[in-house]
Every structure is written in C-alpha cells, then in structure tokens.
Amino acid sequence: MSRIGKRIIEIPSSVQASVEGSKLLFKNNKEKHELETHNRVKITLENNQLSFQPIGEDVQSRAYWGTYGALANNIVIGLSTGFSKTLEVNGVGYKVALGNKTLDLSLGFSHPVKYPIPAGIEMVVEKNTITIKGSDKQKVGQVAAEIRSFRPPEPYKGKGVKYSDEVIIRKAGKTAKK
C-alpha cells in the first residue's frame, strides 16, 4: 500500500480546492493552480480534506495514486507557505545583480550571463546570495538548477554557483616532483 497515496491532505483555510471531473483546482488570494489527474485515480474532497484512491489494483494505478497525492500536497504547501531555494556564488570577481526582469551574473566568462526571471518566480539578491521563491516546487527547483548550471562549483577551490546546503568535496592539487 502506498504510504504517500493513503495520506490525507489537509487543505488550510487560505487555500480553496475544488474537483471538476478529473481536474483539481487550487487557488488562494493571489494565484491558482490546476492539476490534471489520470482516470485511474478517484479523488475525494470532503471537509477540506483531500484523498486519493486507486481505481484498479494494477501497478500503474498504484503508481498514479502516490504521484498525484504528492503533487497535490506540493501545490497546497506552495499556495499556503511557498517554496524557496538559496544559491551562493563563490569566486573572485563573481558578481550577481538583479536587473529589470533579469538576473545578471558575472561568472568569469568573457560576457555577462543574463537569465530572464520566469513568471511566478521571485528573486532576492543579497551580496553573493540568490534566494529563489515561488509557489510551484518544480519551477523553483528548475530555475535554481538552471542558474547553478552556468558555473557549477569546482572541486579544487570551490568557485562557482552552489546550493546553500550543498557540500563540495574538495580535491588536493598537484604535488611537486621530488
């Protein structure tokens, strides 16, 4: 039995949820999200509690059961509290600035990197720290991964863009001949 699928999702008072056929609609005072579900999962919404049940006992139905439970839970958490990721930029001459709808990165290339900020994402820059906030967990993680991919941290000096909780395994440099 799916531990994630059988979990009942409590919907806070700041989020309204409704079921229309195989669609789940979530909204708060600012945003709304829609989750299109598969026909192998039964959706139940009663007393601000959302639950899912597989329609069949086959492997595919049970997989959808847990998947849609996790996706719906992420939407509810995103609309009520939101998600955030923090990136740190380390290196001599590496700079970050917030432009008009773009993030301007100076990462040691011959040109500055301009990253357009997608809709639904908010960024805060303090010194060499970038905080990415949003209500969509997948989009926040994707944006953080794309920014990190411009200059991933290297193992010798640790220069580059890294997650704030990421541990870089350092390597020793070359040793001199005797």
Curated annotation (Swiss-Prot):
One of its GO terms (cellular component) is cytosolic large ribosomal subunit. It comes from the Bacteria. InterPro entries: Ribosomal_uL6-like (IPR000702), Ribosomal_uL6-like_a/b-dom_sf (IPR036789), Ribosomal_uL6_a/b-dom (IPR020040), Ribosomal_uL6_bac-type (IPR019906), Ribosomal_uL6_CS (IPR002358). Keywords: Ribonucleoprotein, Ribosomal protein, RNA-binding, rRNA-binding. Pfam families: Ribosomal_L6 (PF00347). GO terms for biological process: cytoplasmic translation. One of its GO terms (molecular function) is structural constituent of ribosome. Belongs to the universal ribosomal protein uL6 family. PANTHER family: 60S/50S RIBOSOMAL PROTEIN L6/L9, LARGE RIBOSOMAL SUBUNIT PROTEIN UL6M. This protein binds to the 23S rRNA, and is important in its secondary structure. It is located near the subunit interface in the base of the L7/L12 stalk, and near the tRNA binding site of the peptidyltransferase center. Part of the 50S ribosomal subunit. HAMAP family: Ribosomal_uL6_B (MF_01365_B). This is Large ribosomal subunit protein uL6. It comes from Helicobacter acinonychis (strain Sheeba).
